[in-house]
Amino acid sequence: MALALTGWQLVWGACVCVLVHGQQAPPGQGSDPGRWRQLIQWENNGQVYSLLNSGAEYVPPGPQGSEANSRVLLAGAPQAPPRRRGGLRRRQAPSLPLPGRVGSDTVRGQARHPFGFGQVPDNWREVAVGDSTGMARARTSVSQQRHGGSASSVSASASAFASTYRQPSSFPQQQFPYPQAPFVSQYETYDPSTRTYDQGYVYYRSASGGLGAAAVASAGVVYPFQPRARYEEYGGGGGEEQPEYPPQGFYPAAPERPYAPQPADGLDRRYSHSLYHEGTAGLEPAYPDPGPDAAQPNGGGGGGTYGGGGGDPRLGWYPPYGNMPPEAYSPPRVVEPQPPFRVLEPPYLPVRSSDAPPPGSERNGAQQGRLSVGSVYRPNQNGRGLPDLVPDPNYVQASTYVQRAHLYSLRCAAEEKCLASTAYAPEATDYDVRVLLRFPQRVKNQGTADFLPNRPRHTWEWHSCHQHYHSMDEFSHYDLLDAATGKKVAEGHKASFCLEDSTCDFGNLKRYACTSHTQGLSPGCYDTYNADIDCQWIDITDVQPGNYILKVHVNPKYIVLESDFTNNVVRCNIHYTGRYVSTTNCKIVQS
């Protein structure tokens, strides 16, 4: 028993000695201030960087003399060597050490500003930023250090971070006038002096005829990037035959244009005759249409620079028509400007003719409207055209529904006579429920003139409930017809709204608003009435369930002149169940 107790005491004593001895770091390892203790890696813009620190990770408060000698190293790229005076050198990849070079010597590559603005000064030596070659060495050295490396391995890894070596090329180098380094994404400043590739790269010609590049690093890292091919290499190399065409610049030189007289006002009106000028029959067109006779500009034979190949002579100065003489200048005619809209031909206007009028027909232009002037149609309306209101049937069908509301919430609409006659009876109370068939409306002016109210401005009516002026007595009629007989089953009303440009097609400007002086509807614009505004309904409180027809008629009395009155009515099939409605088959009809 005593022998066993003595043995256990010896074992515990040995353990205590080992622990005490382990806390004392041998020189050159834990107490070595030059040892790298921390490694931080991150990636920025596709490049991996490393930050090495010889200090401790956690520093206690207070002055620490041992941490004052700690070092910090940022690794990840070769550093910049002195620039040669002969010209600007490309950025080089790390390579194997040269024969006879000591490991402590360094060859700095050309470092660049992180944003590409020129070169980094040479005095910025301690910290270098670049490609990920140093990171491969960082991982190698750190792994060696973690697996029991000695102080010599630590110093070797430190020198690996701060050094980049070059290797002589195993292939014969070829000089190129304008090389492009594979790792530089920014454009460098042009230097007229001679440029060559660095010896650190190995350029080889692939089987496809292009050039490839491989950077052989000391860590065995191969970069798969290749330089951009130049003009000389599109034809291939080696046994392939180069084309006989001489090299040319990025922008080919254009042939010199012959002198053409300029008009007095400096405006070029060669393309305006067929669009805006009347009476062009007496004038020769600026560009004749290409035809069999125009196939050979040089008289069907040779001559000229390009041999007079066939084609469109209006191509002007571009080959193969560079030898075409300039067209003769024709003085402009004073004409009335036209709106850029295509007016629709109403049925009561004469049939358009594509034949040009005789030369003497310009004198009768005041009595007869021009029927065909290029692609612009001008009827005898003093060049102003007419509006054309068209309601949108899909807009009506999309949002038709039934609403039940108390009469006290419809007082403003009652003042404008938007309810059925039973709502104005003496026995009606504010708590009576009215059933309303609500639907939206969107009207477009697809004509060539403004749709303006027929009433003078000083006669517009002010409605205090809705806070706007009514410029028309009857802009729309809303009626509900029986589907079988076509008779009215609900007391529709005359919607009297203010006219404005709610929205416009692309290229058209809104010019009218719901104010006391600017009401109307511009060409290419829409006057929209949502289903939730007052009077945008039909009172169907007294209507029985069944099938009906909803009729929306715009400009019903034809008071404002339009170019087409056959597209002012929308009809929809309504199925009313007593609780809700379903709307189908909304379309534009004549009446």
Swiss-Prot record:
Enzyme class: oxidoreductase
GO biological process: collagen fibril organization
MF GO annotations: copper ion binding; protein-lysine 6-oxidase activity
Residue span(s) of the pro-peptide: 23-91
Subcellular location(s) of the protein: Secreted, Extracellular space; Secreted, Extracellular space, Extracellular matrix
Reactions this protein catalyses: L-lysyl-[protein] + O2 + H2O = (S)-2-amino-6-oxohexanoyl-[protein] + H2O2 + NH4(+)
2',4',5'-topaquinone modified-residue sites: 529
InterPro entries registered for this protein in UniProt: LOX-like_protein (IPR050912), Lysyl_oxidase (IPR001695), Lysyl_oxidase_CS (IPR019828)
Lineage top rank: taxon: Eukaryota
Keywords: Cleavage on pair of basic residues, Copper, Disulfide bond, Extracellular matrix, LTQ, Metal-binding, Oxidoreductase, Secreted, Signal, TPQ
Pfam family, one: Lysyl_oxidase
Cofactor(s) in the UniProt record: Cu cation; lysine tyrosylquinone residue
Annotated signal peptide: 1-22
Entry's EC annotation: 1.4.3.13
Binding site for Cu cation: 466, 468, 470
Chief place where the protein resides: secreted
Job description of the protein: Catalyzes the oxidative deamination of lysine and hydroxylysine residues in collagen and elastin, resulting in the formation of covalent cross-linkages, and the stabilization of collagen and elastin fibers. Essential for the elastic fiber homeostasis and for their maintenance at adult age.
Subunit structure: Interacts (via propeptide) with EFEMP2. Interacts with FBLN5.
Family per similarity comment: Belongs to the lysyl oxidase family.
Name of the featured protein: Lysyl oxidase homolog 1
Species of origin: Bos taurus (Bovine)
Lineage, uppermost ranks: Eukaryota, Metazoa, Chordata, Craniata, Vertebrata
